[in-house]
Amino acid sequence: MAEQQQQRSLSAELQELVLVALGAVPGALLRWQVALHWADRHLLVNVLGAALLGLLAGLPAAPRRQLLVGIGFCGSLTTFSSWMVDAMQLISAGQIAEAFGLIGLTLGLGVGAAALGFWLGQRLRLLKLPRSEP
């Protein structure tokens, strides 16, 4: 019995790992393409990721969707560390106001995007859409 539960647990973990990986690949590819074509790349991907995570939070719970889109896609799309390096580079260059402007703008837009996404998810939830996995 214990071996059977352990085997099922390993199988479930492997399925979860695959979902995260399947979401991470397109998220990373989108982030890479945004970095190639937009100067404010970190602002764009972080705000987009916040909006999408807000939407997911507003929808009915769906663990597989959270793994695929929330952790996989959004996790590989968004970046905290690169955003902080951008701010530190501005500070190092003596552009302190610009650094704090970048931080404030990203936080403000990110929270606003997450709130808008959550609001939209709640509205979609009210439509009583069928729960899908993922």
Curated annotation (Swiss-Prot):
One Gene Ontology molecular-function label: fluoride channel activity
Record has Cell membrane as a keyword: yes
InterPro entries: FluC
Keyword Transmembrane helix: yes
Membrane topology label: Multi-pass membrane protein
Record: residues binding Na(+): 75, 78
Activity regulation (UniProt): Na(+) is not transported, but it plays an essential structural role and its presence is essential for fluoride channel function.
Transmembrane segments: 10-30, 43-63, 67-87, 100-120
Catalytic activity reported: fluoride(in) = fluoride(out)
Gene Ontology biological-process entries: cellular detoxification of fluoride
Compartments where located: Cell inner membrane
Alphabetized UniProt keyword annotations: Cell inner membrane, Cell membrane, Ion channel, Ion transport, Membrane, Metal-binding, Sodium, Transmembrane, Transmembrane helix, Transport
GO cellular component: plasma membrane
Top-level taxonomic group: Bacteria
Family membership: Belongs to the fluoride channel Fluc/FEX (TC 1.A.43) family.
Role summary: Fluoride-specific ion channel. Important for reducing fluoride concentration in the cell, thus reducing its toxicity.
The protein, known as: Fluoride-specific ion channel FluC 2
Organism of derivation: Synechococcus sp. (strain CC9902)
Gene: fluC2
